[in-house]
């Protein structure tokens, strides 16, 4: 059983991480939020859950033990498969899940695509007394910075730039802020990244001087 992987990030796109461990590349399914915290060429460690089906073996990866436990508990709920469990973790972190279950707030789960009213109620019912958070709420400065850069990348993607271009611009903006001794907060990074991307066209945008199709 593969419980964790540590290696070099070869590529990350959407919900798929390709991690090289001692010359072997492993494809790992992760949440988009987790994917945005990973960088090509960097070292990464993921805790994993191997889901076995008749026609497939799929690795799901998580940044910490709380996410892994929440995923496995969700997969044990009637009507919740691994993809739906991953979708829940994209919208609710383990602490938010624990709070929703404790408050019997099934509406928090109904907001997740693919989770209907019946399944949401089952999640609350079947996870009662099982879900808890083992790590402290306070985040390190590094973790907070990763979240800020991930949020800026997401914002740029929403404005039409590709993930690759957005990542590069945000990394450059963060490096510039560090060189100048300035705080790398979201407004600053977004403003600087947009300034760097100014001359470029977002993916799918009409070329300069041409009207968009109507």
Swiss-Prot record:
**Which residues does the annotated region (Domain III) include?**
144-214
* Keyword Calcium included in the entry's annotation: no
A GO BP entry is: DNA recombination
UniProt keywords, alphabetically: Cytoplasm, DNA damage, DNA recombination, DNA repair, DNA-binding
An example GO CC term for this entry is: Holliday junction helicase complex
Region labeled Domain II — which residues? 64-139
Q: Which InterPro entries does this chain map to?
A: DNA_helicase_Holl-junc_RuvA_I, Hlx-hairpin-Hlx_DNA-bd_motif, NA-bd_OB-fold, RuvA, RuvA_2-like, RuvA_C, RuvA_C_sf
List, alphabetically, the Gene3D superfamilies matched.
Answer: 5' to 3' exonuclease, C-terminal subdomain, DNA helicase RuvA subunit, C-terminal domain, Nucleic acid-binding proteins
- Entries under Pfam families matching the protein: HHH_5, RuvA_C, RuvA_N
Q: Which region ranges are annotated with the description Domain I? A: 1-63
Principal location: cytoplasm
Give the signal peptide, or none: none
Question: Where would you find this protein in the cell?
Answer: Cytoplasm
User: One MF term in GO for this entry?
Assistant: four-way junction helicase activity
Region span, Flexible linker: 139-143
According to its UniProt record, which protein family does this protein belong to? Answer: Belongs to the RuvA family.
The record comments on the domains as follows: Has three domains with a flexible linker between the domains II and III and assumes an 'L' shape. Domain III is highly mobile and contacts RuvB.
What interactions and quaternary structure are annotated? Homotetramer. Forms an RuvA(8)-RuvB(12)-Holliday junction (HJ) complex. HJ DNA is sandwiched between 2 RuvA tetramers; dsDNA enters through RuvA and exits via RuvB. An RuvB hexamer assembles on each DNA strand where it exits the tetramer. Each RuvB hexamer is contacted by two RuvA subunits (via domain III) on 2 adjacent RuvB subunits; this complex drives branch migration. In the full resolvosome a probable DNA-RuvA(4)-RuvB(12)-RuvC(2) complex forms which resolves the HJ.
Listed name of the protein: Holliday junction branch migration complex subunit RuvA
Q: Which gene encodes it?
A: ruvA
């Amino acid at each position: 059983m593969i419980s964790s992987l540590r290696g070099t990030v070869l590529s990350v796109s959407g919900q798929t991480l390709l991690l090289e461990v001692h010359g072997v590349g492993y494809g790992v399914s992760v949440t988009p939020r987790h994917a945005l915290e990973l960088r090509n060429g960097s070292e990464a460690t993921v805790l994993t859950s191997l889901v076995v089906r008749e026609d497939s073996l799929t690795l799901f990866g998580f940044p910490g033990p709380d996410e892994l436990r929440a995923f496995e508990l969700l997969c044990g709920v009637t009507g919740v498969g691994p993809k739906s469990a991953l979708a829940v973790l994209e919208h609710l972190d383990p602490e938010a899940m624990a709070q929703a279950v404790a408050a019997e707030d099934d509406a928090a789960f109904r907001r997740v695509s693919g989770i209907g009213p019946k399944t949401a109620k089952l999640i609350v019912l079947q996870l009662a007394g099982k879900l808890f958070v083992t790590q402290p709420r306070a985040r390190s400065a590094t973790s907070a910075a990763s979240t800020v850069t991930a949020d800026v990348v997401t914002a740029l993607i929403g404005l039409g730039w590709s993930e690759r271009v957005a990542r590069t611009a945000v990394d450059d903006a963060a490096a510039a802020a560090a060189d100048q001794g300035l705080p790398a907060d979201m407004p600053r990074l977004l403003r600087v990244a947009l300034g760097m991307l100014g001359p470029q066209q977002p993916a799918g945008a009409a070329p300069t001087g041409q009207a968009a199709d109507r």
